[in-house]
Amino acid sequence: NRGTKATVFACHVPHPERFGVIEFDRNFRASSIEEKPKNPKSSYVTVGLYFYPGDVVERARQLVPSTRGELEITDLNNQYLREGKISVVPMRRGNIWLDAGTPASLMEASMFISLVEQRQGVKVACIEEVAYRMEFIDDEQMMNLIREMKAGTSYRDYLEKVYKERY
């Protein structure tokens, strides 16, 4: 379906009126998507992670600004919804989405990431590590990335540790 359908990720939140809200039917299929509604129809919201088919650029070019004066991603998602070309994937228990849309939520997200990294000794969302562990890059490519970084930085030191752990 990834070639023809849009995929939207969703999360249950306590204050959905601040986000794009997704309403579901009995079979847990999206029935509506509404941007920052005063009276949300559900507590599930889009988390800002989307996969789109190849026609997305042309569709985006045709969007018109909303009453708020913005091009709304919700309008794009609603095009796919009306055509039955959207899948909504709810985030499962154990996954976390961190809102960073207000100064307070950005601070909370930063503190959470810092705590996880300190307590577990791992980096969160280290793209080089993810690419290496998933074998999108090989040993030589990983070492080239490491060598390009300034020596003695904690990030480079971390990647060197990741590289050495593999052997």
Which residues make up each language-model segment?
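Unchanged
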Residues: 1-167
